[in-house]
Amino acid sequence: GQIHLTTRQGFEIEGIHMEDMDKVNEMLQPIIDNLQINQNEAGTGYPASGTRNVCACIGNRVCPFGNYNTAAFAKKIEKAIFPNDLHFKIALTGCANDCIKARMHDFGIIGMTEPQYDPNRCVSCGACIKGCDKLSVDALKMENYRIVRNEEKCVGCGVCVTKCPTRAWTRSTKKYYRLTLMGRTGKKNPRLGEDFLIWADED
């Protein structure tokens, strides 16, 4: 057969002759074991045809905007849901930039942080205010040379953290997430996923 890499980084082997199926399954078994994929019966190949890979952006391991380790969280989800024949798609993104397009999936997880402000480190330069205004939702303002965050407007993106030159803004130790549901692409009814939970924790 021929190996095909799907858009969700899944491997498909096309054109296998039926008489070669047992041999191919035997060759695949070490790979399935190494990936720790749930399997009811060894030697029978991958146990589901409809499973969609969980997708994730690069997360905070590399990206300065990422609010959490997306790959680690994605692996936890994979262990809980694989294998299955449900044609639903899950995506995780580290911040509100949504590079993975989580809102276009059935189930999207968007990383959030609750910015922590230390007025003793603040020099009132206004870099965070400008950054939030230009790149996010304009949730910051200055009062008496101190920054005030509008908690209702803040989307937890962390732009203020990346813009602050003195580390007066830092990310919260606790990780938060925005969960979106029922996003989809397609010809007839494409739609963005709607918020289901905001400021949720991993549990």
Residue ranges: model-predicted function:
Residues 96-98, 147, 186:
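Short, catalytically relevant binding-site loops at active-site mouths
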Residues 175, 184-203:
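A hydrophobic, small-residue-rich beta->alpha segment in the mid-to-C-terminal subdomain
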